[in-house]
Amino acid sequence: MNILSMTYEKFVQKIQELGLEKYRADQILDWIYKKHVFVFEQMTNLSKQHRSLLRENFCIQIPKIVSKRVSSIDKTTKYLYELSDGNTIESVLLFHEGYATACISTQIGCPVKCSFCATGQSGFVRNLDAGEIVSQILAIEKDSKQTVRNIVYMGMGEPLLNYDNVIKSIKILIDKKTKNIGIRRVTLSTVGIPEMILKLSEERLDLNLAISLHASTNEKRDQIIPINRKYSIQEIINAAKNYQERSDRRLTIEYILIKEFNDFDEDARKLAKLLNGLKVFVNLIPVNSTFSNFEKPAKWKINRFKEILINSGIEAEIRYEKGADIEAACGQLRIRNLLSKQL
């Protein structure tokens, strides 16, 4: 059993079933989550007998670093990890105002296949289990010697299509006995699966929800996000409203700006109208053209789009890519690795 896949309560139960006291579970989790010790033999406040018992019944699966790139611009660090079955995933460590943020993956590949995203181009393999999601945080902290303060579920994959494992991983990471990450420092990014957003509302987790909208009309969104043909923009907005009413959290809207596609004044006005009445913040993101045929709009046009939103009462900011020199955007490192193996 992988300890990283277990909630605190479940781990305590298993420890007690082995005849150990509850406080032993606390000691073990302290070694793992605070000291980043992943080998039972190195847990020196446990007896040899206890360490042997743990080794026979549990494992601590930490992914292997296949590749690591550090930006010379902003110290953003991109990791490519190999899992126990040989599949690879990506995680990114970012720095903002002195705080470390981990951007983590939830699936190997992605079934959504957004046309501007590198991850979808490599195909979908499988969901990550809760332990594989949690392990990314520990692997980042172990290597970087940084304490992750914020977590964004914004790496490879669509989190709401791996709902149970994602929610379980969040509950593990926010537990005071493990990472003790504040729930308001957790952000989940989704293209918008209405029924799953409604289900998330029932969790009462009050995490930050980011909707990857990227268009203000179904006609345009259908062209870049195929799943929109199943879930319309209005259905997504209605579900987001429900989430906001339950959580009282400001929503983040992610909007990729693509030259001469969704960057017109009319697009901005329609977006403002669509978001009217919601407490939202819009991240305007010039498209990354590395693995697509799309181009970034001119800076003046990006600024103009932002200005229209702000003048319409919508908070907005331009989010320029971090780690541009190391291809830190989702899926790029993995797809390069896959391509190299085919040569």
Curated annotation (Swiss-Prot):
Molecular function per GO: 4 iron, 4 sulfur cluster binding; metal ion binding; rRNA (adenine(2503)-C2-)-methyltransferase activity; rRNA binding; tRNA (adenine(37)-C2)-methyltransferase activity; tRNA binding
Catalytic activity: adenosine(2503) in 23S rRNA + 2 reduced [2Fe-2S]-[ferredoxin] + 2 S-adenosyl-L-methionine = 2-methyladenosine(2503) in 23S rRNA + 5'-deoxyadenosine + L-methionine + 2 oxidized [2Fe-2S]-[ferredoxin] + S-adenosyl-L-homocysteine; adenosine(37) in tRNA + 2 reduced [2Fe-2S]-[ferredoxin] + 2 S-adenosyl-L-methionine = 2-methyladenosine(37) in tRNA + 5'-deoxyadenosine + L-methionine + 2 oxidized [2Fe-2S]-[ferredoxin] + S-adenosyl-L-homocysteine
InterPro entries: Aldolase_TIM, Elp3/MiaA/NifB-like_rSAM, Methyltransferase_A, RlmN_N, RNA_MTrfase_RlmN, rRNA_lsu_MTrfase_RlmN/Cfr, rSAM
Keyword Disulfide bond: yes
Domain Radical SAM core: from-to ranges: 96-325
Coiled coil (UniProt feature): none
Subcellular location: Cytoplasm
Binding site for S-adenosyl-L-methionine: 157-158, 189, 212-214, 288
Enzyme class: transferase
General function of this protein: Specifically methylates position 2 of adenine 2503 in 23S rRNA and position 2 of adenine 37 in tRNAs.
Recorded family membership: Belongs to the radical SAM superfamily. RlmN family.
Misc: Reaction proceeds by a ping-pong mechanism involving intermediate methylation of a conserved cysteine residue.
Annotated protein name in UniProt: Probable dual-specificity RNA methyltransferase RlmN
Native organism taxonomy: Bacteria, Thermotogati, Thermotogota, Thermotogae, Thermotogales
